[in-house]
């Protein structure tokens, strides 16, 4: 195994040697590494002076410093990203890819060698820049942040560098020109910049424990992207693909066949298209055309067949993901309940705070607007948000939001116990009436997101990244439209017509409903 990794290191050494010879790569990295830390040191000193001038606390200044460390580490990586973007497609344009691909190295050795070469230089430059920034703080007599903050920023810089470089390598393998690869780089830089903004908010509020979770989450996404590249990298594809063609017809046909289980389009759609054509050209009459009623009956029968065949088949494929997601949800509820319950000593709260907590618990279930359409739209937005986050993170961020939703249930039950309300009563009256429909819906959509991420990084012979994404997306949409949306409709009606009056009746004496 060590010898096999040594062969990959040969590619890494070759790439590093080429990079060190190219002044167009070295010059921007050297300038940014030397100038940017100095600029951030001046910015840190200016920010602290400004805060002190208006009587601000030193805590604000110290919370800004770790964010500037992230910024110092981020910008050199964005410049060095061009090396990773040209890893394969650049060699293809220069005509040097054939000798590399005809070497006796395995596909994973070629890919891993390029990945290591693309990671070492940006990470080294980032750490050098951070070191210069810390040295500048010391020269300006600015106190360093706490060690745990420094460790977190260094870890975040490392995992974000791997994330950006691994995504750039995947883009390089799928692009046909360097120009196309550079244009796609914005899909790497912009999300990471937004991620850094979110991390800066966590730093400002001093949530160190959550920052470690952010490190873990980004590391998992990085590993999944590396896995994605390794699974779908085939050297023959680099030479066989000369031009990119966006075939929307093929995309739709592939998606529709996977979604519906049939190549045929809905008969109602074909009927309306035929009517529209006949209006434009009365001569176009199809004697075999079905009437509107016949098309409706046949499509209704097809929907029943779809529910009887396709939905169970999809759920069977997702069975492992469903069980894992269910276990994660139960664990989140129990963990949150135990954690919240252990934070408060019985009898330590005064009656006024207990009454405020009781009112807050009531509003958490009763809410302000409990109309079915508002509740349905709120739940749809939540599940669409989970789906969007999951699609762009291989399911990781979607599962994180899912854990937060289920942890909220455990926290509410524990809070009910603390303020003197029976957790079982709260569960039966305030959550379960609509929860028996809403919770399975969020479990299924989260399972579909997890399944989508796993499918993308699982090798399937003869299937490209695009095909794997279309098939997985079809399964996700199938579950969402076929099961989750109907469940959310029922949940919204039950929550509005049953949960609200039941909860008001049983807890009206303890929780005034306004």
What are these regions, as identified by a protein language model?
Residues 1-32, 242-246, 250-320:
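Aromatic- and glycine-rich beta-strand/loop motifs that create alpha-glucan
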């Amino acid at each position: 195994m060590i010898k096999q990794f040594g062969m990959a290191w040969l590619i890494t050494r070759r790439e590093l040697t080429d990079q060190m010879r190219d002044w167009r790569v070295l010059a921007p990295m050297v300038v940014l590494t030397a100038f940017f830390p100095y600029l951030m040191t001046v910015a840190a000193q200016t920010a602290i002076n400004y805060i002190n001038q208006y009587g601000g606390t030193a805590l604000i200044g110290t919370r800004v410093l770790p964010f500037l460390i992230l910024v110092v580490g981020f910008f050199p990586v964005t410049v060095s990203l061009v090396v990773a973007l040209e890893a394969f497609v650049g060699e293809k344009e220069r005509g040097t890819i054939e000798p590399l691909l005809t070497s006796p190295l395995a596909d994973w050795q070629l890919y891993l060698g390029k990945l290591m070469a693309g990671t070492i230089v940006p990470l080294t430059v980032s750490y050098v820049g951070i070191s210069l920034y810390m040295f500048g703080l010391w020269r300006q007599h600015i106190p360093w942040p706490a060690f745990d903050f420094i460790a977190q920023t260094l870890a975040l810089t490392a995992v974000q560098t791997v994330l950006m470089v691994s995504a750039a390598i995947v883009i390089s393998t799928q692009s046909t020109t360097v120009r196309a690869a550079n244009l796609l780089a914005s899909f790497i830089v912009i999300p990471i910049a937004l991620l850094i903004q979110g991390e800066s908010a966590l730093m400002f509020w001093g949530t160190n424990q959550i920052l470690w979770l952010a490190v873990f989450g980004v590391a998992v996404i990085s590993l999944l992207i590396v896995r994605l590249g390794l699974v779908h990298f085939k050297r023959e594809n680099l030479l066989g693909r000369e031009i990119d063609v966006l075939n929307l017809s093929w995309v739709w046909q592939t998606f529709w066949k996977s979604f519906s289980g049939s190549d045929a389009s809905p008969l109602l759609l074909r009927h309306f298209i035929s009517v529209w054509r006949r209006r434009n050209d009365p001569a176009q009459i199809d004697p075999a055309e079905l009437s509107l009623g016949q098309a409706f009956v046949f499509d209704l029968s097809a929907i029943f067949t779809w529910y009887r065949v396709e939905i169970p088949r999809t759920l069977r494929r997702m069975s492992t993901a469903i069980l894992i997601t269910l276990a994660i949800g139960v664990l989140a509820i129990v963990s949150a309940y135990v954690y919240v319950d252990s934070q408060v000593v019985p009898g330590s709260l005064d009656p006024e705070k207990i009454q405020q907590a009781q009112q807050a618990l009531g509003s958490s279930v009763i809410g302000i607007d409990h109309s079915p359409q508002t509740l349905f739209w709120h739940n749809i937005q939540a599940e669409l948000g989970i789906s969007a986050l999951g699609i762009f993170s291989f399911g990781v961020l979607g599962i994180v939001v899912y854990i937060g939703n289920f942890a909220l249930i455990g926290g509410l039950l524990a809070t009910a116990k603390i303020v003197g309300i029976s957790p079982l009563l709260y569960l039966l009256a305030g959550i379960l009436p609509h929860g028996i429909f809403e919770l399975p819906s969020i479990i299924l959509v989260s399972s579909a997101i997890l399944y989508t991420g796993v499918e993308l990084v699982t090798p399937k012979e003869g299937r490209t990244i695009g095909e794997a994404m279309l098939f997985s997306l079809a399964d996700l949409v199938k579950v969402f439209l076929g099961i989750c949306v109907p469940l959310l409709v029922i949940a919204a009606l039950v929550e509005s017509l049953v949960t609200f009056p039941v909860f008001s009746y049983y807890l009206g004496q303890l929780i005034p409903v306004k």
